[in-house]
Amino acid sequence: MSRTFIMIKPDGVKNKHVGNILSRIEKEGFKILGLKYLKLSLEDAKQFYKVHSARPFYNDLCNYMSSGPIVAAALERDNAVLHWREVIGATDPKEAAAGTIRALYAESKEANAVHGSDSDDNAALEISFFFKGNELF
């Protein structure tokens, strides 16, 4: 079993896709270890996305991610990172396979409904950013 971190982004929350996405998580065989509904401060968004700080989209990304509530979750199943990446689809919803979360719910490449860790190492870092050990079950 491995873990991954997922986030339902502000557009996914605003457009009322949280229930559908959580249902999909369970249908895909993930165990939800931790779940939080919160609004990131701009400072927290900058810290979370600091790996992108040199990229031209960094400030827009941080402003967007702190613009409204998000849902953060730690998930577990076999091949968690890879499986979640397959479930959500390509970053650009125009390129996402039919039936993936981004094909179904994303507005654009930027407002693409969900985030998913891209490696086991990043999953561990991202989970620890949002959850303390006693908050995971």
Swiss-Prot record:
Family annotation (InterPro entries)? NDK-like_dom (IPR034907), NDK-like_dom_sf (IPR036850), Nucleoside_diP_kinase (IPR001564)
Q: Which reaction does it catalyse?
A: a 2'-deoxyribonucleoside 5'-diphosphate + ATP = a 2'-deoxyribonucleoside 5'-triphosphate + ADP; a ribonucleoside 5'-diphosphate + ATP = a ribonucleoside 5'-triphosphate + ADP
GO terms for cellular component: cytoplasm
Q: What is the lineage of its organism?
A: Bacteria, Pseudomonadati, Spirochaetota, Spirochaetia, Leptospirales
Q: What does this protein do?
A: Major role in the synthesis of nucleoside triphosphates other than ATP. The ATP gamma phosphate is transferred to the NDP beta phosphate via a ping-pong mechanism, using a phosphorylated active-site intermediate.
Question: What name goes with this protein?
Answer: Nucleoside diphosphate kinase
> Catalytic site residues?
H115
Q: Where in the cell is it found?
A: Cytoplasm
Listed cofactors:
Mg(2+)
Does Protease count among this protein's keywords?
A: no
User: What is the gene called?
Assistant: ndk
What's the EC number here? 2.7.4.6
Q: Supply the PANTHER family for this chain.
A: NUCLEOSIDE DIPHOSPHATE KINASE, NUCLEOSIDE DIPHOSPHATE KINASE DDB_G0292928-RELATED
Q: Which residues bind ATP?
A: K9, F57, R85, T91, R102, N112
GO biological process annotations for this chain's record?
CTP biosynthetic process; GTP biosynthetic process; purine nucleotide metabolic process; pyrimidine nucleotide metabolic process; UTP biosynthetic process
